[in-house]
């Protein structure tokens, strides 16, 4: 990966970035209104409908008790990983090409974690009783099982949110100061508070670099451990096709894979609609394309190992569960996942494809569609076909 693709003056960069914040035209408000309308129609209206009619409105049944909510939770947790994780790795390796992308990638981490937390609230069904799950003294004597992987999730994800927030905020302090010096009114007051009196002295830069590097080293194993713990929600059960020791690396690789694809999508949007073509260049897409190729090969290898060991073990439950996933009711989704996540990314072997913006956009979207399908298949197929035939059933998401 080559050097800095942006030999531009910092003054020009600051002016362009600040202009995108303070100079909001009609296009900005149209985009904001569209995003809010889609959120209202696609999320809040269905959620209110579910709150009124019950969790069955989402198609929940027996044995499909997790449905798309758990799949969505895993997907958004995974999508959050590459933002901070990739930024930490590139910072430690001193890769200068990260400068044009790392702040937006880190912002994707925070938004993805917020959406993942919202998926938990939706899945509860009756969120006004969510305090029953908290470990506080009460007359119902309902106590969380501290040995449960679900409680591991809460601790790990809370720690990851805290660490990522501190990491992103610390790196943004000089940016807040740059915006502070170029704004007036309430914006100046807000960014003055956020910048903590940053002046840009050598001493401040030295301390910031030391603390930023320390957090980067800390967050890398933290991010890996978070998705490993999420995988234990499944791997520590005795359900066929879930009780696998390979689930931790499988989930971690999948999380980095989907997160990297998400970064490609975000980078395209910033380049196209915010006129950052000078800063987000072919070099960024080229390097991200190489990373997608490597991750797709790792992901494909783990899938091959999972299928091979499942059939090679000779365990009837595992064999039946894998056969059902490959050739049963959900088989079209499985082969769609393989096509989007294992076959199409091979196009990244060609530099002409990696440096083409629109094809890379469609590939990144296809990869995340495939990765969401993977999470859905993990949840749906494993619960649909267990040991006893009288426990078999189908889960189909409601419209």
Language-model segment annotations:
Residues 1-24:
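Short, Lys/Arg-rich, polar N-terminal cytosolic tail immediately upstream
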Residues 2-8, 48-58, 62-66, 73-202, ...:
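Transmembrane-helix bundle segments that line or gate the permeation/cavity pathway
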Residues 15-19, 112, 340-347:
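Hydrophobic, membrane-inserted alpha-helices
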Residues 19-23, 27-47, 138-337:
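Long, contiguous internal "core" modules enriched in hydrophobic/ aromatic residues
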Residues 66-67, 101, 240-251, 323, ...:
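Non-cytosolic membrane-interface motifs at loop->transmembrane helix junctions
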């Amino acid at each position: 990966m080559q050097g800095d693709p942006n030999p531009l003056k910092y003054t020009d960069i600051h002016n362009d970035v600040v202009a995108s914040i303070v100079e909001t035209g009609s296009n900005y408000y149209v985009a904001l209104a569209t995003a809010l309308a889609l959120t209202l129609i696609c999320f809040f209206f269905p959620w209110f409908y579910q709150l009124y009619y019950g969790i069955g409105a989402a198609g929940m049944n027996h044995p499909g008790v997790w449905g798309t909510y758990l799949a969505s939770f895993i997907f958004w947790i995974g999508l959050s990983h590459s933002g901070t994780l990739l930024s930490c790795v590139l910072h430690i390796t001193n890769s200068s090409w990260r400068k044009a992308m790392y702040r937006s990638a880190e912002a994707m981490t925070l938004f993805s974690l917020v959406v993942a937390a919202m998926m938990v609230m939706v899945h509860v069904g009756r969120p006004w009783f969510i305090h029953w799950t908290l470990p506080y003294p009460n007359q119902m004597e309902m106590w969380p099982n501290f040995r449960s992987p679900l409680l591991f999730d809460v601790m790990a994800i809370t720690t990851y949110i805290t660490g990522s927030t501190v990491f992103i905020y610390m790196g943004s302090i000089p940016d807040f100061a740059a915006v502070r010096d170029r704004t007036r009114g309430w914006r100046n007051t807000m960014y003055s508070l956020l910048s903590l009196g940053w002046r840009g002295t050598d001493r401040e830069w030295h301390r910031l670099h030391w603390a930023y590097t320390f957090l980067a080293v800390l967050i890398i194993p933290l991010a890996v451990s978070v998705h490993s713990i999420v995988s234990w929600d499944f791997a520590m059960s005795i359900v066929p096709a879930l009780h696998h020791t390979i689930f931790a690396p499988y989930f971690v690789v999948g999380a980095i894979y989907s997160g990297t694809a998400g970064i490609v999508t975000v980078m395209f949007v910033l380049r196209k609609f915010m006129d950052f073509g000078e800063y987000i260049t072919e070099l960024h897409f080229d390097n991200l394309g190489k990373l997608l190729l490597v991750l797709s090969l790792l992901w494909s290898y783990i899938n091959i190992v999972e299928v091979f060991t499942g059939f090679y073990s000779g365990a009837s439950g595992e064999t039946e569960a894998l056969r059902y996933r490959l050739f049963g009711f959900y088989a079209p989704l499985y082969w769609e996942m393989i096509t989007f996540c294992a076959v199409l990314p091979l196009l990244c072997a060609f530099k002409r494809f990696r440096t083409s913006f629109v094809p890379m956009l469609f590939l990144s979207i296809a990869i995340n569609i495939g990765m969401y399908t993977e999470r859905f298949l993990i949840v749906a197929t494993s619960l649909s076909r267990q040991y006893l035939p009288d426990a078999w059933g189908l889960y189909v998401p409601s419209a």
